[in-house]
């Protein structure tokens, strides 16, 4: 499964270990029992989620391949429970790929974590022009440094946070749900929200019972109930 995200990014499901039944079997091993009827197995998933017995969900593991701007990746890497491998700009040259937003946002005085889109056309045009010009100038300097023979590990220091990077992310379902609680929420930055929504789509398809129970009992965000998954 793969989804296009932002202007040049993507989210790709590389591998998955387990499903809803993995959590069921992990929960029932304590009693020496396994899978029963679908109805009873689904009810068990809902019981585990409602009563915060979450360790069985750690036996469902996803691996994603992500392409995203560096500023999004740095927010992503704050989620410590998971494994990351990122492309290195010390050993590879950066392609001419940058996140170019199509809108501008301003902070809300009442809530510093939220931002709203700017509708004033003149301000939007001025801000976007400054962003685009800054990115273009930075990349020109980067290429010039490489042409001069400067090492990639030094030339990269002029690159903007809008540069695209790629990484692998391996995460269990319990930690993935924590990610969705924090990033599939209007308080998170809009760009990472877009990735969180696509992750939720994959989660729903691959583990429908777990996702449904998560949305009912444990989801603390606000946008997954407002979008079509």
From Swiss-Prot:
The keyword Lyase does not apply. The active site is at 183 (involved in ionization of n3 of dump, leading to its activation). InterPro entries: Thymidylate_synthase_ThyX, Thymidylate_synthase_ThyX_sf. The keyword Transmembrane does not apply. One of its GO terms (biological process) is methylation. DUMP binds at residues 75-78, 86-90, 156, 183. Residues 1-217 form the ThyX domain. Pathway: Pyrimidine metabolism; dTTP biosynthesis. FAD binds at residues 55, 78-80, 86, 172-174, 178. Keywords: FAD, Flavoprotein, Methyltransferase, NADP, Nucleotide biosynthesis, Transferase. Pfam families: Thy1. GO terms for molecular function: flavin adenine dinucleotide binding; NADPH binding; thymidylate synthase (FAD) activity; thymidylate synthase activity. Its EC number is 2.1.1.148. Belongs to the thymidylate synthase ThyX family. Homotetramer. Catalyzes the reductive methylation of 2'-deoxyuridine-5'-monophosphate (dUMP) to 2'-deoxythymidine-5'-monophosphate (dTMP) while utilizing 5,10-methylenetetrahydrofolate (mTHF) as the methyl donor, and NADPH and FADH(2) as the reductant. This is Flavin-dependent thymidylate synthase. The lineage of its organism: Bacteria, Thermotogati, Thermotogota, Thermotogae, Thermotogales.
